[in-house]
């Protein structure tokens, strides 16, 4: 997974997308502390370390070791999202990517409420999860995905936690038709997208993702293969 995070087109594109959506809202002070929640190897959140000390919390020790090796600005903490032991108002930002969907997290709304608790007033909380309930595929089974979210559901969870939503959008909309088709073709088979087609059809998918990011600078989409919410804890 660590190697895929460096080379796979989706991880590269996702880092750029998250930067675009989250960076403008980060606290501009040197002592700001950030959290990459369930950050794994840092494949999607390592860029946060450029903005100050960043705690990466994950249950997998090997992933944490890889993250700290690749991003020395990380402070590794072993734990899971269902038992966040951080003090109230600890972080200037909280990032959580493709983790609320996991089977090991039975109550994602409760986790988002915890994010709101540990976020300081004015802090940004960014959530990115698999989108499209009808787009279930064998990749979801292999990666222990327990649920997919609509943009509306992710928005409702953030608002239910008392957060003010800044941006709510779908992403990777151009992947919806092929994902639907692959779901039919792969039915009953155990296959994952990790390590598959790392170049993104020779750069084509990366180029489409770049075009979509330009669109998302000004607009939002109601659907996509991913659902994203960027919110803020009220002052």
Give the location of each predicted region.
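A C-terminal cap/extension of S-adenosyl-L-methionine-dependent methyltransferases
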Residues: 175-235
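Class I SAM-dependent methyltransferase Rossmann-like catalytic core
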Residues: 1-12
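Class I SAM-dependent methyltransferase SAM/SAH-binding core
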Residues: 33-35, 39-83, 110
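A conserved beta-strand element that flanks and buttresses the S-adenosyl-L-methionine
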Residues: 95-96
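Conserved alpha-helix/loop element of class I SAM-dependent methyltransferases that forms part
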Residues: 11-31
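Conserved S-adenosyl-L-methionine
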Residues: 163-173
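Short, glycine-/aromatic-enriched active-site segment of Class I SAM-dependent methyltransferases
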Residues: 125-147, 153-156
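A short glycine-rich, Lys/Arg-flanked "PGG" loop and its adjoining helix->strand segment in the class I
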Residues: 109-124
């Amino acid at each position: 997974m660590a190697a895929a995070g460096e080379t796979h087109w989706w991880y590269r594109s996702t880092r750029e997308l998250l930067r675009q959506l989250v960076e403008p809202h980060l606290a501009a002070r040197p002592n700001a502390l950030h959290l990459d929640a369930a950050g794994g190897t840092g494949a999607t959140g390592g860029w946060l370390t450029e903005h100050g000390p960043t705690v990466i919390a994950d249950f997998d020790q090997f992933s944490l070791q890889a993250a700290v090796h690749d991003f020395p600005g990380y402070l590794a903490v072993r734990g899971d999202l269902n038992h966040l032991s951080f003090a109230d108002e600890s972080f200037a930002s909280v990032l959580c990517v493709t983790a609320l969907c996991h089977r090991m997290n039975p109550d994602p709304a409760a986790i988002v409420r915890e994010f709101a608790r540990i976020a300081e007033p004015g802090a940004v909380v960014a959530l990115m999860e698999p989108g499209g309930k009808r787009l279930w595929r064998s990749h979801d089974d292999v990666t222990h995905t327990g649920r997919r979210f609509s943009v509306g559901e992710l928005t409702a969870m953030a608002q239910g936690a008392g957060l003010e939503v800044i941006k709510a959008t779908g992403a990777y909309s151009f992947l919806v038709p092929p994902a639907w088709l692959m779901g039919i073709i792969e039915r009953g088979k155990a296959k994952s997208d990790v390590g598959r087609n790392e170049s993104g059809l020779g750069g084509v998918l990366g180029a489409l993702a770049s075009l979509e990011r330009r669109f998302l600078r000004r607009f939002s989409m109601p659907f996509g293969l991913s659902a994203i919410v960027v919110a803020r804890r009220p002052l």
